[in-house]
Amino acid sequence: EKFVMISTDKAVNPTNVMGCSKRIAEIYVQSLARKLSLENKNKKYTSFITTRFGNVLGSNGSVIPRFRKQITDGGPVTVTHPEIIRYFMTIPEACKLVLEAGGMGSGGEIYIFDMGEPVKILDLAKRMIKLSGRTEVKIEFTGLRHGEKLYEELLNVKEQTEMTYHDKIMIANVRQYDYETVKEMITELVNTTQSYDSMKIVGLMKELVPEFISKNSLFEELDHKNEKQEDHKSCGELLDHPSELKRDASSLN
């Protein structure tokens, strides 16, 4: 049997809770797959595979149906930022590639898909207005939402890819995690959700996914605290190694 988890490009260097939750799911699924492969070398077991891609055209909550409704209602068509871009796939493309990745995966892989060139959302809005024939409809910029990026990434800067036999499917080489450690941290996170303390919950998420840096959000203060702790730690390390402190000071002369 195979289990295919659907992830998103928002899991890469996440800037909001949704993207981070997807990255946590990736980490859990991949660490579980690794554990099962080590424990069941000569037995059958469920293979856990992850697929990571961008926006699916026409799916529930996607930008196309929203723009279509706004145009039908006479506008305005709302775009968050004039420079925002996104990767898109059609529903048939997404289904086909997910099934293909599920078929080729043996367990633990994170598959990413070649989605071509990203699309500027403003250009998409203009084209839809033009095709509708309702050129009087205006476009309104509403500003980036909490945790929203101008562009999404399919890979972290530390990640690399391996090619597969399919020219549109690649494997992301990501950091490996110990399953028991991940399980312990996720259990703590789940238990903490019962407190409804959003700062504490997001703080634990940031421990699991250190590259989760909040953007346009009240959770940014957690990142500032982490930066101060890192600075304090670095200072302490230098005091523990005075020769390094002396060397750094001499380099300034």
Predicted regions: what they are:
Residues 1-26, 31, 37:
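Conserved Rossmann-fold NAD(P)-dependent oxidoreductase catalytic core, especially the SDR/UDP-sugar
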Residues 31-253:
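Strand-loop microenvironment adjacent to phosphate/nucleotide-handling motifs in alpha/beta enzyme folds
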